[in-house]
Structure formats: C-alpha cells, structure tokens
C-alpha cells in the first residue's frame, strides 16, 4: 500500500520593497504613533498661536536706489489671522505690477521691490498691515542716486552791445551736482555784471551790459559722485 505524499507547506512570497506595510508589525505601529503625536503637536502649536492685531518685528530701513536698478524694502511682521498688506509712496497706494512687486518671502517677511529705478522713485514708502483685530504700519525712504547729466545745453547766442545775455542749461543729478561755468577754458570770476545761478533743475549764466570782449566759447559743467557732463555754447556780441 503506497503512502500518500505529504502536503506541501505554502510558500510565503515577500512583497516588493516599499509596496506593502504590515500594520501588525510593532515597528510600523511605533512609527505611526510618533507621526500622529507629531501632527497633533503641530496642530496644537498652530491653534495656540495668539490671535491679535499685527505687529512690526523688524522695521523697514532706508535704502539707496541707483538709477536703472532695483531696490527692495523688507519688513518682518507678526500677524494672526493672516493680514492684508498695502504699500504706498508719499501717501499714494502702489499697485502690484511690473514697476512695484509685492513679495512674500516667508510667513513673517514681506517686501516691496521697486524696479527700473529713476529719480521719480525718491520718496517715503509705507507698509500698512491689517487683520480683523487691528493694524500696524511702518515707513522708510528710498534715496535715489542718479549720475549727473545736462538734459539740455545752453543755446548759441548773438547779442547787441549793452544788452543782457543769459545762457541756461537744464541739469539732472542726485546727489545734487557741483556746477561751474568757464569762458574760453578759464573759470568765470563772478561779479555784479557776470554771474551764474544754480537751481534744482537749471543753471543760468547772466552777462549784463554785454561788450564785444564777452564774445567767446562758454562751457557749463556738472559733476557728482556718479559722473560728470558738460556742454558748450557760443556767444557773439556786436
């Protein structure tokens, strides 16, 4: 009588690594407990965050903007619930767009980027932070530096003897430039008859009771820490 063949034991096939977790594995259960505890702690910290009006933690600071470049004003704030941010320049609201960019670098840091710097960007910038519990604000200045230049030089002039001659140049620059005038390469020595004035955007040379000796080549020059410029004009008195 032949004996029956012994029954074969089922062969366990291990799942591919990373595909299946055995929830009965003590290590898996321990890891799950730690994850849940960490998540509950995170929720608790978030829920315990104090609600209230916004506060400025690190104020804005004055910055220097070079013509043609960009500048950034940065402020660190504390606010919960999340606030509404508004930036303004000299009291006028600035819209987020190509020229002015609202930047949120992390939950507590906000910034304003001013692009394509020009002299018109000089001024006081303010941030206003508002949430349902209140508001706070802060301000700083953007100081603009522009290489000096002569926007429009003086015109060549013909005058009659005894009349008054004026030569005017339109100038630009920040910091405000040093300005000078020369005649035939020599610095002009001012007196009550020949003198020049310097305004915020113009400089004017005045020659009273002009004589033929006042004829010549006149030069105006401007210079600041970022550059210099010059322009010429011819005066003929007869």
From Swiss-Prot:
CDD domains (alphabetical): IQCD
Protein name per its UniProtKB record: SPEG neighbor protein
Pfam families: I-set (PF07679), IQ (PF00612)
InterPro entries: Cell_Adh-Cytoskel_Orgn, Ig-like_dom, Ig-like_dom_sf, Ig-like_fold, Ig_I-set, Ig_sub, Ig_sub2, IQ_motif_EF-hand-BS
Stored SMART domains: IG (SM00409), IGc2 (SM00408), IQ (SM00015)
Segments forming domain IQ: 29-55
A GO MF label: protein kinase activity
Organism: Homo sapiens (Human)
Gene that encodes it: SPEGNB
Ranges of residues in domain Ig-like: 54-143, 147-236
Keyword entries, A-Z: Immunoglobulin domain, Repeat
Domain of life, source organism: Eukaryota
